[in-house]
Amino acid sequence: MAKAANTAAQRARKKVRKNVADGIAHVHASFNNTIITITDRQGNALSWATSGGQGFKGSRKSTPFAAQVAAESAGRVAQDQGIKNLEVRIKGPGPGRESAVRALNNLGIKIQLIEDVTPVPHNGCRPPKRRRI
């Protein structure tokens, strides 16, 4: 019984406000969704948001507007943690790449660097077959 009360207290614990000035925004833009994670320089997550988590479902998750809303959400939480400068690392070919970066810039966060870290195979795995529509 005491263990159940202990876990409830852990869940209700207030988020610790970190005072971090510089961070890294990892934007993972796939064809189906966009995931934005803002970390400190060591890689510890400060905030994150997804297009699907912002209420967009189905094909609307993969729109640039959904990526913009997700980036604004993650950026606001990161600003509360003290983030002022960001490096942006973009991964993936999705439609939310540019709009996520613009949304972070419009929040007043200074973007120092934009880097594309999309993994490119050196002729590794066989790709999926072409779609016939």
Curated annotation (Swiss-Prot):
GO cellular component entries: ribonucleoprotein complex; ribosome
One Pfam family linked to the record: Ribosomal_S11
Molecular function GO terms recorded: rRNA binding; structural constituent of ribosome
Keywords: Ribonucleoprotein, Ribosomal protein, RNA-binding, rRNA-binding
KW Ligase (keyword) present: no
GO process annotations (BP): translation
Function: Located on the platform of the 30S subunit, it bridges several disparate RNA helices of the 16S rRNA. Forms part of the Shine-Dalgarno cleft in the 70S ribosome.
Assembly behavior: Part of the 30S ribosomal subunit. Interacts with proteins S7 and S18. Binds to IF-3.
HAMAP family cross-referenced by the UniProt entry: Ribosomal_uS11
Family: Belongs to the universal ribosomal protein uS11 family.
Listed name of the protein: Small ribosomal subunit protein uS11
Organism listed in the record: Ralstonia pickettii (strain 12J)
